[in-house]
Amino acid sequence: MTLLSTFDLTYPIVQAPMAGATTPELAATVSNFGGLGSLGSGTTAPDVLNEHINTLKSLTNRPFMINLMVLSEHDSNTLDSPTPAWLTKYYQEQNIEMALPKRPALSFAEQLQVLYDNPVPVASFTFGIISAEQVQRLKDLGTRVIGTANHPLEAKAWAEIGVDAVCVQGVEAGGHRGGWLPQSANDPMGLLTLISQTRACTDIPLIAAGGIMTGQAIKAIQTAGAELAQIGTAFLTTDTCGINDIYKQALLDASQDKRSSETRLTRLFSGKQARGLLNDYLRDFGQFEDVHNLPPYPQLNAMTNDLRAHA
């Protein structure tokens, strides 16, 4: 059975679940047109997540996907790294007040419980791996399960616990990289290489993500061995996307002017590798990218939250 039939899709397109950018309206629109609409919910409180699921169910009778970020209770509850001096100084220079939360991230366990209590057609996971028991519990509720991998070893690990598919995310992808093994950060692979090497070690159905914007690119990933294309950036400037108009205009400008379209892979926003447009913040503080004491995710993410909100 192909993923098109497994997920009951008309088109081989998955709208990427970009936390902070996707909305129930965007996901429902994509699903209603025959793709797999997705809602990035890793930063969504459990009660709001439940409301979003109910909204999606009211807007579409087609399959849709909820994506969560896998974090241990310790990581989501620990904020013990000192704020870097350069970041504190930047807040002061910009006259922005930093208000650190009591915990740097929401409880993954509580978010996952929402998916048990209010089952969804498809659930995907990033930043880590769940257990085989959790996969089976979701599948017993009728939920299809997708893992995320930046390295073949991660894809193989997902396959071994019984998921329905794995989204392999090449280094070209915008936003956060979803892998968790050291190899995925130390040896970033281009998408076609990642598909090829993953295909050599597992026959799990693959969804490809990373720099896909055209039908020709979709053909290329299908030829390489993936079945569906997960596309994010192309949806960011749509009416139902949740980012503000300034960000949307920056993306539109970048599509017209190569001088403003340079991207960079960085840990400076969240502590975890993510690709974004090169801006003054990255230019000014790129020298701190590889310092050994850069706070990890999600701690640095909490430290830069007010800065990103101000921007």
Residue ranges of model-derived segments:
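Active-site entrance/lid segments in N-terminal catalytic domains of soluble metabolic enzymes
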Residues: 1-201
